[in-house]
């Protein structure tokens, strides 16, 4: 997968930033980020840098039990005083993403969830909100590439069958079905690594 960057002309090196969040729930207007992870790569998806941070629970947030079970986050970890506050974590995330700009920001199902939650986090903590699509940055969603590949390159990926008997494109089942040992699903950094793996599989078929 190669792109020309808008500020550098044809042939300029593009960097991708693959990122993921683990949260207290699925409501992007209410829930908060508990873990953020990102890996920056070159245009051949070779790793250049990585970043990961966890933070403490905000006092007004009631986490969903299902989210804690899925992520394996214990009540003790939620209030661990050695972790940064939500505000401190947001500042570090914003600073790192700014340092990595301009880039193409990518996630898995990120456009409908992680992207919205990240913007809400930056809004709440007085950080620049539209980091991923301003100042030369662009964004995308690897799930959209997965959906497109099933039409234009149906043999590129093995699409597993879920418990309902229907095809599923959830990352924690898609990655193993295509040969990736995704043993730590719903850890933000592990999910980023799995997302890069899927992107590479699609890239080899492009």
Predicted features by range, described:
Residues 23-25, 144, 194:
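Short, glycine/acidic-enriched loop or turn micro-motifs at the edges of active sites
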Residues 104-117, 153-206:
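Acidic, Mg2+-coordinating catalytic module of metal-dependent nucleases/exonucleases
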Residues 134-161:
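Short alpha-helix plus adjacent loop in nuclease-associated cores
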Residues 73-76, 80-85, 128, 150-151, ...:
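A broadly used, surface-exposed interaction patch
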Residues 120-134:
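A short alpha->loop->secondary-structure connector
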Residues 95, 99-102, 123-127, 145-155, ...:
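Alpha-helix capping at helix-to-loop junctions
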Residues 2-124, 168, 172-178:
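Conserved non-catalytic scaffold segment of RNase H-like nuclease domains
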